[in-house]
Curated annotation (Swiss-Prot):
Protein family (similarity comment): Belongs to the DNA mismatch repair MutS family. MutS2 subfamily.
A Pfam family annotated for this UniProt entry: Smr
GO molecular function: ATP binding; ATP hydrolysis activity; ATP-dependent DNA damage sensor activity; endonuclease activity; mismatched DNA binding; ribosomal large subunit binding; rRNA binding
Transmembrane segments: none
Alphabetical list of Gene3D superfamilies matching this protein: 3.30.1370.110, P-loop containing nucleotide triphosphate hydrolases
Protein name: Endonuclease MutS2
Gene Ontology biological-process annotations: mismatch repair; negative regulation of DNA recombination; rescue of stalled ribosome
Protein keywords: ATP-binding, DNA-binding, Endonuclease, Hydrolase, Nuclease, Nucleotide-binding, RNA-binding, rRNA-binding
NCBIfam families attached to this UniProt entry: mutS2
Organism from which the protein derives: Lactobacillus johnsonii (strain CNCM I-12250 / La1 / NCC 533)
Keyword Cell membrane belongs to the record: no
Domain Smr: 713-788
Purpose of the protein: Endonuclease that is involved in the suppression of homologous recombination and thus may have a key role in the control of bacterial genetic diversity.
């Protein structure tokens, strides 16, 4: 891409924002050098990677990456077998630690249904050489400080240094707190040349013996190392020298080990840089409220509610921009200061952002393509000077475009033909457009020449467009109107400003009939288009609301079905457990009787009667279990298949099995909704019984809706378990009824039910928020719940 074009479209400001959002220096540098690509596969891959990190940011938050230094210089030194210093090794340890953290952070992405294939190679590079990591972790801090645990010798040396230093300080403290204080300039201990000394008055320098290391500027104070601590200080220096030697040995050992893993270190550093860079892309998308562009290879642009990313979101006016659908050339006509130039810049900048793998500031589903080149001749419509020099520069740029343009390019020209005689300028603009269209490029131009309005109607795959003007406010709205040419509003503006109506009417009469008819036609077309757009927007909002409601209902039904299924499974397990216990009791009775018989003893009559009574009781209990609804459902579980009409027991409604999802799991169509159920939760309806069951299902549905209609649930006077069960059912019903706000009345009492209610609400993913009711509506005796 031409650097001048990138500068004109202010792409550099975008990548500066991107760089600011990166954490590591290498990622910041990568952001500042990011250029749009003209390779479709590269662009798609880049967009896919941005999508992955945007999903990660949304689901898990930012990557656990902190800043680290560029490791390339250290790797060069390792390559020639040079030793690294502590800071360099600490930086490598930091890189490996971050890689380990990020690897753990991304381990469950697939479980969270995030497709990581676009960054799979990058994630695989997060491979930690465990022996190097273990050694560095034992030996060094991130800032390069060598740890005591680096070696047993170093640990002992540092212990000895600390102990010896304590002895020195104790001796010195005796000097500054005892009878020797009269000989000191100050009662302090200081250090000179790495040795502990006392500030002694010049006349008492021989009182302490030892060595004079320094003196004050006046010569009145001498810094003396007393004879009593001279040996200790010498030992301290010796220990510290040994410490330095041991640290040097450790750094050599660590450098040699790091040299064995140069490739792994580079791979981890590169992977972290790439993930930081992609994370910056996702953060930029979030900050701009940008969306993923849908890429196509048909050179089609279809932007919905596109916003210029560098204009204040509170002030910018979003526009729909199209090219390559039913037209390849768009002529935006009309007066200056209406937003024509910004429209061109928005189109060009969003196209550059997409080709750089960035999300765009437009509505979801907006389409963009990948151009080989983007040509732009754009000035500032607020300050264009119609001069010969401007015209020459303008023509020079256009001539270069005409020489190089192809069908794979996008051409953006602001004020085509401006800067010369209007008649000649219009003719020249038409000829230039014909030439550019001959190359089959995608073209968007702005012009104030009225002659080009007819061009937009007369040429194939060419359309007019204009910027809307509010005649009541006498101000531009900055909305783009595709298909409607710009019109002069001079008469309307003059009339609005109070010009004599006679003068305005005379001015209108001086226009030729053809121009007058065209203006009237444009006015009618503008009104009709505006009405159609308003209707379309209303219908779109209604459709969006319906889709959202359907999704909420579907999610609510699925969740409710899961809860019911869990209860059914618990009941089944309990029934199975009860049956097993009864069988064990029966077996024990029989075994006891058999043992007595085998022992040769006579079984007493009362024992036989007791055994028979126990067996009869078990038989009755087993019959009750056999009649248990849960067990009956269990027996019916294998009796359904695709196409069967069934009753979904958890909903009390009738539906048709449309798909078998897995063993014992089916998809059932209930009206407009599809729900996932298990075969335990369905009952096959025979053909003869279907009408009757359907009637019951309708009645059940109506009854259910009736219960859902209530926006209050009163739990006062209920037991704790009963209250929470009723609360669970009520929330489910409220979700299915589409209620957004409900009130739970739990009373004050001991607070047990109130606490139970709020614990339940805290765990429920369909509860957006909750709070106590206002004082006049129950206060702490009621909780208002907001559902989502």
């Amino acid at each position: 891409m031409n650097s001048k074009i990138i500068e004109k479209l202010e792409y550099n400001r975008i990548i500066k924002q991107l760089s600011d959002l990166a954490i590591t220096v290498p990622a910041k540098e990568q952001a500042l050098t990011l250029m749009p690509s003209s390779n479709f596969d590269e662009v798609k891959k880049s967009i896919d990677q941005t999508r992955v990190l945007s999903n990660v940011l949304r689901v898990k938050g930012p990557m656990p990456i902190t800043d680290f230094k560029d490791v390339r210089a250290s790797l060069k030194r390792l390559k020639v077998k040079a030793n690294l210093n502590g800071e360099e090794l600490g930086n490598i340890f930091l890189i490996l630690s971050l890689a380990k953290d990020v690897s753990q952070f991304t381990a469950d992405l697939e479980e969270r249904e995030i497709d990581t294939r676009p960054i799979e190679k990058t994630l695989k590079n997060l491979a930690i050489p465990e022996d190097l990591f273990k050694k560095l972790n034992q030996a060094i801090e991130y800032d390069g400080t060598v740890k005591d645990t680096a070696s047993s010798k170093l640990m002992q040396l540092r212990h000895d240094i600390q102990s010896n230093e304590t002895d020195i300080k104790n001796h010195m403290n005796d000097y500054i707190s005892g009878k020797h204080t009269q000989y000191l300039s100050e009662n302090i201990v200081t250090i000179r040349d790495g040795r502990y000394v006392l500030p002694v008055k010049q006349e008492y320098k021989n009182k302490f013996g030892g060595v004079v290391h320094d003196q004050s500027a006046s010569g009145q104070t001498l810094f003396v190392e007393p004879q009593a601590v001279l040996v200790l200080n010498n030992r301290q220096q010796n220990l510290m020298a040994q410490e330095r030697q041991e640290i040097h040995r450790i750094l050599i050992e660590l450098s040699e080990l790091a040299g064995m893993y140069q490739k792994e270190i580079k791979n981890n550093a590169d992977a972290l840089t790439q993930l930081d860079f992609l994370s910056a892309k996702s953060k930029l998308a979030k900050a701009m409220k940008a969306t993923e562009p849908v890429l196509n290879q048909d050179h089609v642009i279809k932007l919905r509610k596109a916003r210029h990313p560098l204009i204040d979101p509170k002030k910018v006016v979003p526009n729909n921009i199209e090219l390559g659908t039913s037209f390849d050339t768009m002529l935006i006509t009309g007066p200056n200061t209406g937003g024509k130039t910004i429209t061109l810049k928005t189109l060009g900048l969003l196209q550059l952002m997409a080709q750089a793998g960035l999300f765009i500031t437009a509505e979801e589903g907006s389409q963009l393509t990948v151009f080989n080149e983007i040509y732009a001749d754009i000035g500032d419509e607020q300050s264009i000077e119609q001069s010969l020099s401007t015209f020459s520069s303008h023509m020079d740029q256009i001539i270069k475009i005409m020489k190089d343009v192809t069908e794979d390019d996008l051409v953006l020209i602001d004020e085509l033909g401006a800067g010369t005689d209007p008649e000649e300028g219009a003719s020249l603009a038409i000829a230039i457009l014909d030439d550019l269209r001959g190359a089959q490029a995608k073209i968007a131009i702005t012009t104030h020449y009225p002659e080009l309005k007819l061009y937009g109607y007369n040429r194939a795959r060419t359309t007019n467009a204009s910027m809307e003007f509010d005649l009541k406010k006498l101000a531009p709205t900055y909305r783009l109107r595709i298909g409607i040419p710009g019109q002069s509003n001079a008469f309307a503006i003059a009339h609005q400003l109070g010009m004599n109506e006679v003068v305005v009417d005379k001015a209108r009469s001086l226009m030729n009939d053809e121009d007058s008819d065209i203006n009237k036609m444009i006015e009618r077309l503008t009104e009709q288009t505006k009405a159609a757009e308003q209707l379309h927007e209303t219908l779109k909002q209604n459709v969006d609301q319906s889709i959202t409601l359907k999704r909420q209902l579907q999610n609510g039904l699925d969740w409710y079905n899961q809860q019911v299924q869990k209860q059914l499974e618990k009941a089944q397990e309990k029934a199975d457990e009860m049956l097993a216990k009864k069988r064990q009791k029966a077996d024990k009775i029989i075994n006891d009787l058999e043992e007595q018989r085998r022992a040769g003893g006579q079984v007493r009559t009362n024992k036989v009667i007791e055994a028979k009574g126990a067996l009869n009781k078990l038989e009755r209990e087993n019959q009750n279990l056999a009649q248990n609804k849960v067990l009956q459902r269990e027996k019916r579980r294998h009796d359904v298949s695709v196409g069967d009409t069934v009753k979904v027991l958890s909903y009390g409604q009738q539906g048709v099995i449309t798909k078998k999802l897995a063993d014992h799991e089916f998809e059932v169509q209930i009206g407009i909704l599809k729900v996932k159920v298990t075969d335990r939760d369905v009952e096959k309806i025979s053909t003869q019984a279907a009408p009757k069951k359907a009637e019951r299902a309708v009645r059940s549905s109506r009854d259910l809706r009736s219960t859902r209609a209530s926006s209050e649930l009163d739990l006062r006077g209920q037991r704790y378990e009963e209250a929470l069960t009723n609360l669970d059912r009520y929330i489910d019903s409220s979700l299915l009824a589409g209620l957004n706000t409900v009130t739970i009345i739990h009373g004050i009492g001991t607070g047990a039910i109130r606490n139970g209610v709020q614990q339940y609400l805290k765990r429920n993913r369909h509860v957006k928020s909750y709070s106590y009711a206002p004082a006049n509506q129950g206060g702490t005796g009621a909780t208002i719940v907001y559902l989502q």
